[in-house]
Amino acid sequence: MYFFRALLSPVVMWPALVSGKSNSNTANYTVEELWDLEVTFWDNFLYPANVKQVEAINSTLFTTEVQGRVDITRVFNGSELNTEYIFGLFSDPNHLSLVGVPIAYSITQFIAERNIASATTVVTFNATSFGNLLLPVTIDTWIMWDADGRIMQYDATFRWFGFLLDTLVEALATSINGTASQATAALTQLLATTVCDTHDKYCTGENQQYDNSTACYDFLTTAIPLGKDYELGRDTLLCREVHEHMVQYDPKMHCPHIGPTGGDYCVNDQTYEQKVLQKYFNVSWIVGVPWTGNIWLGD
């Protein structure tokens, strides 16, 4: 990176202007400082450090209006919502979960400039619901920090997630001495039962989504599919499994997500093209060049 900086030193470094929005944040960190910020995030992502972040309700690692996108799910706005999903989703080893809790990580790729870092991190999860199976999960991230060292934007991709789901099904098949189809059916039953138990406990009164446990179970096992690897943000059981973890923190917000309507998260409201071309981020990820064609920037 320093070699390229030397080559470009005589050149004017233009901000990336797109629809009047640029990466004009005053933060201008060194590579070492960005590395430290990256490490700080992942240190807090691990269990049990993530529990403390969840208990804070609004993690100080995020700005108040943080924007986040995860490829297999959806976009998440604001510090409270991101605290619940980024830290709360993987913070209870005793609760049924697909991947369990993160216990270690290794950053395998890293490059940084100004207030942005792009990295690949292999996170080891203890899949406590699958016999404490240790799973390496590869997560690609782009993270942008403000001048106070808080995350203002992130874009995350779970690499090889379909392969991961198949591995979990195979592990379950081995444990029940059955076929992959039998394991998938067993997983469907386990997830549906857990979602319905959570609904019965937290989604009461105005937050109730199903008439009773039987109606809940029947809907989750017959009316919607389990879901594919890219459908954790669509009308599937896997999507409701993700949001089930969050219900305890804010039933009013999250109960609809596990209900029949799916709220505004577990719904089939996007085509493939709309997903890819969604205008979302407030600040351009492009720095150092006067590029005006970033189609991901919001209006």
Swiss-Prot record:
The keyword Transport does not apply. GO terms for molecular function: acyltransferase activity. Keywords: Acyltransferase, Glycoprotein, Signal, Transferase. Pathway: Secondary metabolite biosynthesis; terpenoid biosynthesis. Its EC number is 2.3.1.-. Residues 1-20 form the signal peptide. Coiled coil: none annotated. Glycans are attached at N28, N58, N77, N126, N177, N212, N282. GO terms for biological process: terpenoid biosynthetic process. Transmembrane segments: none annotated. It is an enzyme of class 2 (transferase). Belongs to the bfoA family. Acetyltransferase; part of the gene cluster that mediates the biosynthesis of an ophiobolin family sesterterpenoid. This is Ophiobolin family sesterterpenoid biosynthesis cluster acetyltransferase ATEG_03569. The lineage of its organism: Eukaryota, Fungi, Dikarya, Ascomycota, Pezizomycotina.
